[in-house]
From Swiss-Prot:
Name of protein: Calmodulin-binding protein 60 C
InterPro entries according to UniProt: Calmod_bind_C (IPR046829), Calmod_bind_M (IPR046830), Calmodulin_bind_N (IPR046831), CBP60 (IPR012416)
Keyword Transcription regulation: yes
Upper taxonomic lineage: Eukaryota, Viridiplantae, Streptophyta, Embryophyta, Tracheophyta
A GO term for molecular function: DNA binding
């Protein structure tokens, strides 16, 4: 008994000793490092890149193997191979090589019972070419031949340069299935006129799913009885699929329209999983899909989920990018003289700096880094972006390539003080005193605006000279203006330097022979001002005035009677005599601008009052 107890005790001691040794060894061994998340992501990306590389190399390897096999066969049987590959052609009279050719691409996919059309609904044209000259054959009996339209197997892959014999062409004809109607109905013959023909109405009665390659081609051949004794090579189209008309309701659009439902895009089935996920995220049409893809493509991928593979995503993205965009543009003004321009799907398209427009592809790498920050800022503050029609921004000068975007321009400003816009009294053309029309007392040769420590030339100056100002008055009395974003500062000054030969606005008005009868009544001024306010260009002007909000000091924050306006450029008296007929309209135009300014002041005051009420409500809630 005691012996057993001793044996058990010894065995327990040995086991305990072994466990202690194991623990010491484990403590001495360094712990295995767990892979970091970044390394896991890198490995996953490497695997994905490797898969893409393999998929891209596959067709190249297939082509190389095919070429090597052809070379090996050529060595084994060169005579047989050359006999097989040489095109069996019979040249026309005079050694001409005549070929038929389709000049239009088909709109695919096609559906049974539907008319065969070209891309975007265009007609399908065919021509007879003389390949020795490369021109359409317009004379001779061949140029008036009749042609048969036939259906070919999609496996007829012989390249145009290789040529084919008439027997090969006939061997790939496809006939209707037993017990079915003719596969192709309608105008199955075309008559050439001076070597050119147009296909009539053609309709497929059966789909292409029952043949091995599941695709058809259209072919053209010369009808029997024409061009006897000469070889005219047939024509064929690209392979295409003909689907059952019941699937036309789910047809994809090529190209898709912005207002199309999102399931019109490839890889998104109607009422399918992807369609439901997009609708749940508030994406219902192609425009909304494209906008999110531009602003945050990763978020869009997350919405679609893991069921969307990389290849499916690439196909979907490529199809969506073929969409035709509208002419609407969006501009975000992060600074007074800088505007970031986006197209209709919120994609960055260019930069406005001063009076220049810089397309996105003209920016240098350093400039792109600066612009990327502005684009992100615009996406974060999209409620501040202003919508324009692209035609309204055509007044900016476009720069194709630039090395530097310089926001401060050289200035030369005299020390003479500026004159208030509304302090000038203008006499009528008949030399009698007139009402106090707003005008400018002097004409400046150069105008520059100072804001803080920077100097800016006004963007695309409102009017470069008096002659331009007169030509900008249209026949309807509307004023066409090209203005940049409003700029401002607390210590704003506008300094002018008068030319010696011109004294005042009165002198300019006195040079005109044509006058106005009496004074303009208040009712007439109001009527013409209302007419001007309805003008599209003036509406654009008012939108520009109201875009800065109420937190900055701009020319619009100044008093109505002390508005500093851009001065004219230096011109000679000969310029004024060139167009005297528009002088009266010029004065009326200035009156309209004055009315627009007052209306702009009113709108801004109302906006400021609304903002103050909102702030007060927020403070009360706190």
């Amino acid at each position: 008994m005691q012996t057993r107890y001793m044996e058990r005790t010894n065995s327990m001691r040995e086991k305990r000793k072994l466990e202690e040794d194991d623990n010491q060894q484990q403590q001495q061994q360094p712990e295995r490092k767990r892979p970091a998340l970044a390394s896991v992501i890198v490995e996953a990306l490497k695997m994905d890149s490797l898969q893409r590389l393999c998929s891209s190399l596959e067709p190249i390897l297939r082509r190389v193997v095919s070429e090597e096999v052809e070379r090996a066969l050529a060595k084994l049987g060169p005579a047989r191979l050359s006999e097989r590959s040489s095109p069996k052609r019979i040249e026309g009279i005079g050694g001409r090589n005549l070929q038929l050719q389709f000049r239009s691409r088909l709109s695919v996919p096609l559906f049974t019972g539907g008319k065969i059309e070209g891309e975007q609904g265009a007609a399908i044209h065919v021509v007879l070419l003389d390949m020795t000259t490369g021109h359409v054959l317009t004379v001779g009996p061949e140029a008036s031949a009749k042609l048969d339209v036939v259906v070919l197997d999609g496996d007829f892959n012989t390249e145009d340069d290789d040529g084919w014999s008439g027997e090969e062409f006939e061997g790939h004809l496809v006939k209707e299935r037993q017990g079915k109607r003719p596969l192709l109905t309608g105008d199955v013959q075309v008559t050439l006129k001076e070597g050119v023909g147009t296909l009539g109405e053609l309709i497929f009665t059966d789909n292409s799913s029952w043949i091995r390659c599941r695709k058809f081609r259209l072919g053209l051949r010369v009808s029997s009885g024409y061009c006897e004794g000469m070889r005219v090579r047939e024509a064929k189209t690209e392979a295409f699929t003909v689907k059952d008309h019941r699937g036309e309701l789910y047809k994809k659009h090529y190209p898709p329209a912005l207002d199309d439902e999102v399931w019109r895009l490839e890889k998104i089935g109607k009422d399918g999983a992807f369609h439901k996920k997009l609708n749940k995220a508030g994406i219902y049409n192609v425009k909304e899909f494209l906008r999110l893809m531009v602003k945050d493509s990763q978020k869009l991928r997350t919405i679609l989920g893991s069921g969307m593979s990389n290849r499916m995503w690439e196909t979907l993205a490529e199809h969506s990018k073929t969409c035709v965009l509208s002419e609407m543009l969006y501009v975000y003004y992060p600074e007074d003289s800088v505007g970031v321009v986006f197209n209709n799907i919120y994609e960055f398209s260019g930069l406005i700096s001063g009076k220049q427009y810089y397309p996105a592809d003209s920016l240098s790498d350093n400039q792109k880094g600066y612009v990327d920050g502005l684009v992100r800022k615009a996406y974060e503050n999209w409620e501040q972006v202003i919508e324009y029609d692209s035609k309204s921004l055509m007044n900016f000068n476009q720069v194709s390539k630039t090395d530097d975007i310089d926001y401060s321009m050289p200035v030369s400003v005299p020390s003479q003080p500026s004159t208030s816009y509304s302090d000038v009294t203008v006499e009528a053309y008949n030399q009698s005193p007139a009402s106090s029309f707003p005008g400018q007392s002097q004409l400046a040769d150069t105008t520059y605006m100072h804001f803080g420590n920077s100097s800016f030339a006004p963007q695309d100056q409102l009017v470069n000279n008096t002659h331009e100002s007169q030509s900008m008055i249209n026949s309807n009395g509307g004023v066409r203006l090209a203005l940049g974003p409003a700029t401002g500062s607390q210590n704003q000054e506008q300094l002018v330097h008068p030319p010696p030969e011109i004294n005042s606005y009165n002198d300019w008005s006195n040079t005109c022979n044509r006058g106005v009868d009496g004074f303009l009544s208040e009712e007439e001024i109001r009527a013409r001002s209302n007419e001007m306010l309805e003008n599209d260009d003036m509406q654009q002007l008012l939108r520009l005035f109201s875009m800065n909000g109420g937190d900055q000091q701009t020319p619009l924050n100044m008093g109505e009677d002390s508005f500093g306006f851009h001065s004219f450029g230096q011109t000679s008296m000969a310029d004024y005599e060139e167009d005297r007929s528009n002088s009266g309209k010029a004065v009326v135009g200035w009156l309209k601008i004055k009315a627009a300014m007052r209306w702009g002041f009113f709108i801004r005051r109302k906006a400021a009052q609304r903002r103050a009420q909102i702030v007060q409500l927020d403070e009360d809630d706190e």
